[in-house]
Amino acid sequence: MASILPASNRSMRPDKNTYERKRSVYVKNPYLEGMDEDILYHLDLGTKTHNLPAMFGDVKFVCVGGSPNRMKAFAQFMHKELRLEGDGEDIEDICAGTDRYCMFKTGPVLSVSHGMGIPSISIMLHELIKLLHHAHCCDVTIIRIGTSGGIGIAPGSVVITDTAVDSFFKPRFEQVILDNVVTRSTELDKELANDLFNCSREIPNVPTLIGHTMCTYDFYEGQGRLDGALCSFSREKKLDYLKRAYRAGVRNIEMESTVFAAMCGLCGLRAAVVCVTLLDRLESDQINLSHDVLVEYQQRPQLLISNFIKKQLGLCDQMS
């Protein structure tokens, strides 16, 4: 069956020479051009109700993460790091009219929550990418900041993803469109990953590595946990699976990276995934960290991304 969008699985990532000019945000949907109005329903924004270029035209960095509270805290942190006016404590949620996602803007940095799992982040990404396109943004870098389960590495380690893989350790995202399965690449920007890793060397006591990230559709059975409401496999099979994942280059597991990599690549966005690990899945299934340790671990990717953004903006002298 022929697709009405035959090129929808072909990346719009520009070549290296294009990076020296302007990188636009592409949308691969011919029907958008003919729409009188585009309502970004889940963000409570729209092309007629809001002046998107005025609101978002200066955005250069988009940071997304699952938790609304964590993304608000990151926005407040960036407000201080960029030394913007005010204390940032009363920062406005741009998406306050909806309870699906939250969004905060601090200078050229946009912080957005995406919920948990592929369906939730994909909805947000569709509308976020359209927002950036309607706002005529260019040279945008998008980074997912998250938590994850590690494989064979110490809790608290930060993993910068070089390749997002599925549950079969393959670098692909399979999207069901109508009654077709469309396979899309999960390639991420390797130069960006290396830049982030180099930034991590300047942050003490934050072990950081580059590795594959496995994306699953489920937190329990899909990640081989023995502590869910359902479990149909043995401890031995679980460990065999996770060890095979490790041998395939996987260093952490989460639930969003494949669709994130696929959609960002298709739309010409320079993208990275940076997640801290909360446990070693070869040792345990449950997260039993104290609150203080959990908070400190969650701040580690934020410190790295803040360092990277300030370097890109030429604000290295403002390192705190």
From Swiss-Prot:
Task: Give the UniProt tissue specificity note.
Answer: Liver specific.
Reactions accelerated catalytically? uridine + phosphate = alpha-D-ribose 1-phosphate + uracil; 2'-deoxyuridine + phosphate = 2-deoxy-alpha-D-ribose 1-phosphate + uracil
Matching Pfam families: PNP_UDP_1
Which GO molecular function, any one, fits this protein according to its record? uridine phosphorylase activity
| GO CC, any one term | type III intermediate filament
Provide the binding site for phosphate. G66, R100, R144, I145, G146, T147
Give the protein family: Belongs to the PNP/UDP phosphorylase family.
Q: What is this protein called?
A: Uridine phosphorylase 2
Annotated coiled-coil positions are: none
* Swiss-Prot/TrEMBL GO biological process terms: CMP catabolic process; dCMP catabolic process; UMP catabolic process; UMP salvage; uridine catabolic process
> PROSITE patterns, from UniProt?
PNP_UDP_1 (PS01232)
Q: What induces it?
A: Directly up-regulated in liver by HNF-4-alpha (HNF4A) binding to the promoter. May also be indirectly regulated by signaling via various orphan nuclear receptors. Strongly up-regulated by a liver X receptor (LXR) agonist. Slightly up-regulated by a pregnane X receptor (PXR) agonist. Strongly repressed by a peroxisome proliferator-activated receptor alpha (PPAR-alpha) agonist. Slightly repressed by a farnesoid X receptor (FXR) agonist. Shows a diurnal expression pattern with peak levels 12 hours after light onset and lowest levels 0 hours after light onset.
